[in-house]
């Protein structure tokens, strides 16, 4: 068992700061218990495990995390999995909070194997801004309504699941200019 207090850790492009909590190692399993950390411009708590017990070539990761005040853009810049699964984060402004329960195998680069990734969660944001999306720009031009070029949403909650490398969401509401829309899928 190890009580952790680390100021800054670099993991690929991701910077993790102010790590504190308890870690233990036994039988090829690193367990994390209520680890606190700074990530993506916000604060997080995480519990879970990293295991090489079953297959050292494909470590298993189990993670339960709660993140508050994180930046959409910082998350996109720092996390390759988000670049692959949620490319719209590159064009999204604002901060979010996230509750996540995730299971996956890791590849040789310590990245999640998207074919083994399963997760459920909920992302919440008080203010989301999405712009420079080609489809919405074309719609705005066709309808001669520049308000349609950007999506803005307040107090959004999106429940989602990830299976077989695909994200699905339960229905949620956004505004496209002054037009309300309901999305899911």
Role assignments for model-derived ranges:
Residues 1-15, 20-185:
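Small-residue helix/turn framework positions
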């Amino acid at each position: 068992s190890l009580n952790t207090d680390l100021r800054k850790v670099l993991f690929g492009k991701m910077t993790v700061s102010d790590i504190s909590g308890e870690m233990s190692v036994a039988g090829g399993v690193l367990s994390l218990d209520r680890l606190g950390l700074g990530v993506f411009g916000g604060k997080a708590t995480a519990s879970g495990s990293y295991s090489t017990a079953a297959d050292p070539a494909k470590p298993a990761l189990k993670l339960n995390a709660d993140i508050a005040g994180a930046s959409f853009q910082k998350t996109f810049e720092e996390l390759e999995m988000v670049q692959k699964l949620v490319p719209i984060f590159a064009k999204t402004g604002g901060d979010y909070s996230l509750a996540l329960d995730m299971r996956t195998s890791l590849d040789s680069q310590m990245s999640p194997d998207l074919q083994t990734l399963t997760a459920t969660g909920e992302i919440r944001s008080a203010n989301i801004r999405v712009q420079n999306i080609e489809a919405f720009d074309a719609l705005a031009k066709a309808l001669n309504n520049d308000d349609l070029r950007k999506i803005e949403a307040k107090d959004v909650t999106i429940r989602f699941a990830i299976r077989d490398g695909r994200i699905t969401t339960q229905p949620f509401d956004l505004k496209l200019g002054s037009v309300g829309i309901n999305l899911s899928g």
